[in-house]
Structures are given as structure tokens and as C-alpha cells.
Amino acid sequence: FLGITLQYEMCYTNILQVLELSEIPLRAADRSDNDPIVIGGGPCTYNPEPIAPFFDLFYMGEGEVIYDQLLDLYLAHKEAGGDRSSFLKKAAALPGIYVPSLYEPRYREDGTLSSFEPLCPEAPASVRRLVMSVLDRADFIDTPLVPFIRVTQDRSVLELMRGCIRG
């Protein structure tokens, strides 16, 4: 797996750079069984469509609620000799997991989303976000890995525009 946190829309181009530098095909449709499953999570997954072609799946809401089940599913699937596409179909059946390749978004002339059609029975008609109601039950890393280097520590974010330009 390659997990990417989507904190800000302005960081989307960095995702492409990470994939390119890792020699992972940019588009999920071009990946083989030998490539990692690219997973998106974080606040920007509430509007995943602009970057959906680059991700195999998204956690909708808080991934801590479901990631153990997803990992167990993956391990069992690999042990059984399953392929990438069948794993993604099984993953889509888990609550809070959105697999873009299993849906056909349709847009209006103005570019807004008009409908969202599942392409297979495993894909639910809608994907509901997951919320961890009691944070005390969550597993957290005691000592997160954050590189102590200038490029990481000496930076700031400047947001020039906020909100949707389409009203």
C-alpha cells in the first residue's frame, strides 16, 4: 500500500510527483498486480473526483475506523492468490471505502456532478463517511516519523483563494 493524506487541494501536484518518483504508473487504470494499491485519505477525500484517476481507493471519513479490516481483507486476498481488480471489488464492499474505478461519474454542462453510477454489484450506490465517535479507542503512533530537515521544518502554507468558484 501507498497511503497519501490529502490535506489541501494545492498539494495535488505533489501526489503526481510522488507517484512519478516512485515509478508507480500515474493512473490507477495503468497499474498492474505488482504495483502498490494507492490509497487517499484526509479532508480532501470529501471531493475525490478531481484526483480519482490517480487513486485505487479512498478512505471516506476517518480511516482508523476501517483500516484494520481493509488490511485483513488484503492479506487474506493475497494468500488466496487474488488479483488487484478482485481485491478492489471486495474493498468497495467495506463501509467508508470508495473505489473510483467501480463508478461512472456523470457531469452537467457546467461541470458539476449530476449522477454517480456503480459499475458492478460490489460497489454500493453511495459511500458513507466513517466517523470515530470515541477517539480514546483509536490506535495512534506514539512517536510519528517527521524528518528533521530544513525542507520539512522551515515552511509555511499560503492559501490564496478559498471555496468553490462555481458557487
Q: Residue locations for each model-derived region?
A:
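Glycine-rich beta-alpha loop elements in corrinoid/cobalamin-binding modules
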Residues: F1-L119
